[in-house]
Amino acid sequence: MRSFLSRFRQPTWLATLCFLMVTALLSACQKEDTTDYTERDEALITAYIKDNNLTGFQRQPSGLYVAITQPGTGANAQTGQAVSALYTGQTFDGKVFDSSSNNNNTPISFVLGQGQVIAGWDQGFALLNKGSKAILLIPSELAYKGASPSSSIPAHAVLRFDVEVTNIK
C-alpha cells in the first residue's frame, strides 16, 4: 500500500512546500510597526525640557507641548485661515533639518487645519496669533510617525520647532 504523500510527485510537493515557506517569511518581514511611541515620546519631551532648562510649556491633550516665548496680537489662527511663519526645525539632538533661513527668511505659508503640514503644526499654530513666537515640541505621532521624510529626520522622531507667526489671513 502506498502512503498518501507517495501519490504526489516529490519534486512538486517539495516545490510547493518551499513556496509556502518563502511566502510565510516574506509576509512576516512586511509586518507593520504597531509599537505605541506615546510613552516614549512623553518621556523624551519631559527629559528634554528638564535637561535644557526650558520653561513655560503647556502640554496639550494630544501630547504636543507649546511654549509661547513672545505673545502676539489679535485673535489666534483659525482653521481655514492662511498662516505665514518663520521656523527652524531640529531633532532633539540639536541637528537642524530645516529652516526658513535656508530660503532667505521667506515665511512658509499654509492653510491651517487642512493637513498641508504635520499635525503638530496644525495644532500648535491654532494656539498662536500674529507676531507670536513659540517653541513646539512635537511627539512622533503628530510629526512624521514611522516615516523618515529625509536622512535628517529618523522614523519616530520627536521634533522641536521654533516658530514665529508673521501673518494670518
Residue ranges and their predicted role:
Residues 2-169:
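Cross-family detector of peptidyl-prolyl cis-trans isomerase
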